[in-house]
Amino acid sequence: GKGLGRVSLGAAKIQQTAEKVTTEATAATGTINYDVITQAVWNFTTNASGNWTLNIRGDGSNSLNNIMDVGESITIAHIVKQGGTAYYNNAVQIDGSSVTPEYQGGSAPTAGNTNSLDVYTYTVIKTANATFTVLAALTQYA
């Protein structure tokens, strides 16, 4: 398989795992390249300044398509700080190509939540070569 430091454990039991969190004084806006090789959770600590497109990829040198096998999934989280004017993730891409996520509750968000932390979670399932299903959710923390 491909993977990111993959280990085959057979029928082993996993007690716990730790996921890499990157925290940056960055404002969500424009197109954001989410490099899954770098982190599982990305925390933006500056108020969002515009709606944004999230492009999920392996990293600047590796496509998500090339690092995942068919039948694999990854789950990532994007924490976005919101101020008095809130913005939202209005588009999702994988390796630069648009995808339409399936949102929890059936509807994509149309706004962010003021004076909150908005946490977007995405489960990306590779169903065929360069074909992905994206399950998404937005949760407000205040």
Model-derived segments and their meaning:
Residues 3-94, 125-142:
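Exposed extracellular interaction/assembly regions and N-terminal maturation sites
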Residues 95-113:
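Terminal beta-strand-rich extracellular "head" domains
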Residues 116-125:
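Extracellular disulfide-bonded cysteine-rich modules/repeats
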Residues 29, 113-117:
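Solvent-exposed, conformationally flexible loop/turn segments
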